[in-house]
Amino acid sequence: MNSEVLLIEGASLMNIKLESEQISKLMNYLKLIIKWNKSYNLSAIRTMEKGVYKHLLDSLSVIAYIKDKSLLDVGSGAGLPGIVISIMRPELLVTVLDTVGKKCRFMQFAKTQLQLKNLNVIKNRVENYQIEFCFEQIISRAFSKVEKILKLTQHLLCNNGEYLLMKGAGFQQETLPYGVDIQSLCVPEILGKRYLLIFRREK
């Protein structure tokens, strides 16, 4: 079974119907990751098949929780999940942020190659990143512990904004904020449980 079929069928199992343009861009994005990996070491994933599950489908698992205006992906690395979200939601302003130059160069290249006009690539430390507006949602897939993420990014989130923190089962050992909403994520072929921690900032 080829990688494109794995993507389509995996997304279908998550109740996500992909359009042809989305499939094309997602597959081309994954090919870029695999190609650049040879020189840039962007990810431990080296094959298209594993990339479909570990990168694309894992990132797609949060799509139902994404709102309409602005999203910041902190510690985005190769652009996960931010670039996947940008492909799926072209009307949404997506900012991907990382401190590592080679990863930001890759994300900028992917933006150009995939013509993602709604994507903004930032090389900076999140605690030093300053903006004139605020983000409706802040997402993180593999950046840091919950307590540290909240501390470093609080100046960037709108009142009534949301944190979306993607975690494995180990999050249970962390200090969690009061009122956190814990959602199980269904990702085909992923060993180990995946969770989305949702924390809403009140006025």
Swiss-Prot record:
Binding site residues for S-adenosyl-L-methionine: 75, 80, 126-127, 141
InterPro entries referenced in this protein's UniProt entry, alphabetically: rRNA_ssu_MeTfrase_G, SAM-dependent_MTases_sf
Keyword rRNA processing: yes
SUPFAM superfamilies (UniProt xref): S-adenosyl-L-methionine-dependent methyltransferases
HAMAP family tied to this protein: 16SrRNA_methyltr_G (MF_00074)
Family per record: Belongs to the methyltransferase superfamily. RNA methyltransferase RsmG family.
Described purpose of this protein according to its UniProt entry: Specifically methylates the N7 position of guanine in position 527 of 16S rRNA.
Protein name, as recorded: Ribosomal RNA small subunit methyltransferase G
Organism annotation: Ruthia magnifica subsp. Calyptogena magnifica
